[in-house]
Amino acid sequence: MNDEPFDDDIAYFHAQWRRQRLTEKGRDYVVLDGVKGEGHYVGTYLALTTLERYWWGEGEFKFYIDDDEEYPTICGTGTEDYFGGSWSFAKQVNGKTVEQNYCTPYLGYPYYSSHDELIHNDYHNDDCPPMRGFYRWHIPDPIRFL
């Protein structure tokens, strides 16, 4: 390892991991903060468990970039829209709404489950709150910051 400081124009990789048991109503959930220097936002993987069985997707993704304070540079219309699932991630099958997973190179919904497949108990069902996994990589649409 070189103990000398790096030049200011060298790119750094920043990654953050967060977990919050319950989100607070009316308060934004922060995905990334505290990044210094210039670069571009590469993407997000979001794992989400809903504690109710009904619609979970509202809550727009906001990107406060550089000197943004009151209003974000980018503001979406809903969590499902950010991950490419406008009008939900579902289809109708025999009169029932069924979750529809998908994967593309830059965004997707690869995981859905409402069953706990790791635990078996003869006295209880294997159902659990719905769990979802989403990703979006900003390769074709980089979000740059200075």
List each language-model region with its residue ranges.
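Beta-strand-centric surfaces of beta-sandwich/beta-rich domains
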Residues: 1-146
